[in-house]
């Protein structure tokens, strides 16, 4: 090779490796950086069960997965733990069923200046079927409001027969387009009315808290034109 790129870092999917081996690779990385040796050898490692990672992105799958920006006005996550057991300490214990690696929370903004990934959602199961079931449940408990995300797309992918059977290749999404990108249904008028009522209530509450702040006024006045809100 005239040139070879070296990525001396952990793989993006390292949580999957951690879940099926029970070892904290980030801790190992820090220890090696401090001059220590790896605590185990390759032949000492064993794989247990199955793990799946879903990367929750601020993007619009229906528009070619274009990145989205905005503020996370609501971000509810499934019940999870930060990490897993250490296999070396208790070989009989199982890894956590659900793990979330996230660097944002409700109120934070996803900007165009950085990667639009919101979180990594990782599950473990004794079998692939169990891992899939746990991922479906975890995605169903993931609720994000404020911008477009790929959560619904990932949920449809998890129930796709080809994906469930691990019949995977780079043409899967295009072949399964009809199932993965169903026609959008119209939002009921009742839902729109409730959304408008919530916005008005939130703005009224904020105006009451900031009544002495002229910059908090949002009445929409415009010079030489009629204000119309849509």
Region locations from a protein language model:
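Conserved metal-phosphate-binding beta-hairpin within the catalytic cores
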Residues: 1-11
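Catalytic cores of soluble metabolic enzymes centered on carboxylation/carboxyl-transfer
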Residues: 15-230
């Amino acid at each position: 090779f005239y040139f070879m790129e070296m990525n001396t870092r952990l793989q993006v999917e390292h949580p999957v490796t951690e879940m099926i081996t029970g070892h904290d690779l980030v801790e190992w990385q820090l220890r090696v950086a401090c001059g220590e040796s790896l605590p185990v050898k390759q032949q000492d490692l064993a794989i247990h069960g199955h793990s799946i990672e879903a990367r929750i992105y601020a993007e619009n799958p229906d528009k070619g997965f274009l990145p989205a920006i905005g503020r996370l006005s609501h971000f509810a996550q499934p019940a999870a733990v930060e990490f897993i057991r250490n296999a070396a300490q208790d070989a009989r214990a199982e890894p956590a069923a659900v793990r979330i690696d996230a660097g944002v929370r409700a109120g934070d903004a996803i900007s165009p200046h950085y990667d639009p990934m919101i979180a990594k959602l990782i599950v473990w199961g004794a079998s692939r079927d169990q891992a899939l079931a746990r991922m479906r449940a975890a995605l169903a408990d993931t609720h994000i409001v404020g911008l477009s995300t790929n959560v619904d797309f990932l949920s449809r992918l998890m129930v796709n027969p080809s994906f469930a059977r691990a019949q995977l290749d780079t043409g899967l999404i295009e072949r399964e387009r009809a199932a993965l990108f169903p026609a959008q249904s119209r939002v009921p008028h009742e839902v729109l009315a409730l959304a408008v009522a919530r916005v008005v209530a939130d703005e009224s509450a904020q105006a009451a808290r900031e009544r002495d702040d002229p910059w908090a006024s949002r009445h929409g006045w415009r010079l030489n034109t009629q204000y119309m809100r849509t």
